[in-house]
Amino acid sequence: MTFCFSKALGAPIGSMLLGSKEFITEAREYRKILGGGMRQVGVIASMANKSLDLRERILEDHQKAKDVFDFISEKQEFDGFFKAEYKNTNMIFLKFSDGANSQNFIKNLEKEGVLSGLINDKTVRLVFHKDVSTDDLVHVKEKIYSSSLI
């Protein structure tokens, strides 16, 4: 199993590989064979360690996603256009109905300063993180609403 310190935890770089002693020994051998490795990685380790100290903050990101999900769920105007899915993470997935144009939706959001990701033709992903403020959440809700009406 791998664990990334930069995803959601906010460290600028770093991952951890987890496994049995035998597995880690084998992974180190492959790393040497492939020429991987870095020197003086203490500064990276310190940033990863700091991100672990702040790990409870990720719950705030989950709450941001839940807040936007609740907003979407309360609006009947979205029925027939897309359905939101939230699974207790910092992400919301918008599943678009047949005939609804997810790519235009993304373009309209982007024009308004809201970035999202196209997973496939019918699914858009919204990700919430430490740099999304309360004011940003209000902006995101407004732009999701107005972009869905176009």
Identify the meaning behind each predicted range:
Residues M1-M91, F96-S97:
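Active-site C-terminal subdomain of aminotransferase-like
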Residues E77-S146:
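Conserved C-terminal alpha-helix-loop-beta "cap" of PLP-dependent enzymes
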